[in-house]
């Protein structure tokens, strides 16, 4: 559930391009994000406390489509599902047989998943952005411009122009690392993937 809440809420020496904050970094990140209108992938997520102790490890699969559609399915160790139809988000917990439905917060600082599936044309209004490149991997560090956020910093890493991993660090130093594998971009995704059907007999909570 921590991954879902946070998303609502990612020895060798190389020649490194120093981090710098300018319009080129913003434009490059925006271009990389916007060129993938859909994404599907497996993910593995690891959460560590401020001292580096492992708190949680989960795996699953995700599907994203612009603007604002996503399906984030955690399959182990505990199944959970988060689905956005662009207007509302449904959180399904099979163990509790409970669905929580809430309005989708369009602010990128409150819903990190929208960085991969939403409108990022005004990303510089929400974040200070710096970039560095090493060994064919481009890292973008995003620092929220306001304090009313779910995280203190977010790193997005791209390999060969495709999202490879992301890391979120919260106010107490906990790190959530998400690695994507088998990434496929700009392939057709069934509309039903982003429409959550409430299971019969499930408890429904509207927020």
From Swiss-Prot:
Keywords per UniProt: Chaperone, Periplasm, Protein transport, Signal, Transport
Function field: Participates in the translocation of lipoproteins from the inner membrane to the outer membrane. Only forms a complex with a lipoprotein if the residue after the N-terminal Cys is not an aspartate (The Asp acts as a targeting signal to indicate that the lipoprotein should stay in the inner membrane).
Record PANTHER family: OUTER-MEMBRANE LIPOPROTEIN CARRIER PROTEIN
Gene (UniProt): lolA
GO-annotated cellular components: outer membrane-bounded periplasmic space
Pfam families reported in the protein's UniProt record: LolA (PF03548)
Residues making up the signal peptide according to the UniProt record: 1-21
Key word Chaperone present: yes
Superkingdom, natural source: Bacteria
SUPFAM superfamilies: Prokaryotic lipoproteins and lipoprotein localization factors (SSF89392)
UniProt-listed CDD domains: LolA (cd16325)
GO biological process: lipoprotein localization to outer membrane; lipoprotein transport
Predominant cellular place of this UniProt entry's protein: periplasm
Protein name: Outer-membrane lipoprotein carrier protein
Quaternary structure and partners: Monomer.
Localization (cell): Periplasm
